Swiss-Prot record:
This is Testis-specific serine/threonine-protein kinase 4. It comes from Homo sapiens. The active site is at 148 (proton acceptor). It is found in: Cytoplasmic vesicle, Secretory vesicle, Acrosome; Cell projection, Cilium, Flagellum. One of its GO terms (cellular component) is sperm flagellum. CDD domains: STKc_TSSK4-like.
Amino acid sequence: MGKGDVLEAAPTTTAYHSLMDEYGYEVGKAIGHGSYGSVYEAFYTKQKVMVAVKIISKKKASDDYLNKFLPREIQVMKVLRHKYLINFYRAIESTSRVYIILELAQGGDVLEWIQRYGACSEPLAGKWFSQLTLGIAYLHSKSIVHRDLKLENLLLDKWENVKISDFGFAKMVPSNQPVGCSPSYRQVNCFSHLSQTYCGSFAYACPEILRGLPYNPFLSDTWSMGVILYTLVVAHLPFDDTNLKKLLRETQKEVTFPANHTISQECKNLILQMLRQATKRATILDIIKDSWVLKFQPEQPTHEIRLLEAMCQLHNTTKQHQSLQITT
């Protein structure tokens, strides 16, 4: 695996439970499974706390994942500290596996909640969505995009607060400005950045991704947030993702709401602002200032708002003189 400074080297062993024991982690039951490995509960004996251990098999994982996406995921998570993001503690590498030690969210995920209980009340949807908004505002203010927002990546702690997880497609958006520029001036260039790595699930993907076009990753995040909010209050996805051509057609139209759900007009308006074409789509700054979100917001993220406002102001001033950057 590349970027060796990201990981701690671990002794070679065939049994990952034995290796985890050496580091003080007593591995328990599996709580999640993915393409390249599984997530387990574990007890960290040195601090007497429960954690989550994501164990990735190098044999199952692709070279692209091991050499590009996994190091990027760890690098991103190492710089993040926010109450609505899953905390990263450490990463350990052996000859056959990579172990990522994370904060444990003991309440399952929001998708499981919806499948069990159905649509959220609007106050509960407002609570969870405003927490999601605060977490994404924090990311975007640091020029970081998630690119895989979906209900199953919104975990719940024991108090049923949202914890955004799975940063496998997250990235720090590059800037073409010299290091000597002010941080805010360098950051603003992210708004002129387009991605061409087509990440995430079709059901949550913006129309630009579905059409295979370079896309603004900040606006792809806010589209996914629109899908999430719709599903919270309706209990099903806004678009049929079983057929790609049908999905693409549906995402070009204004989303409709079922008559048998009581949803406030404020909530509907916000969803419509997020589920629209990129040139008119709400940014995270628009969302965080929205009247419906403000009713449920536990606190005003004044630092993030100031950063985002400065970035938007600079972007609007300089965008005519900037060329688009396209990366993966």
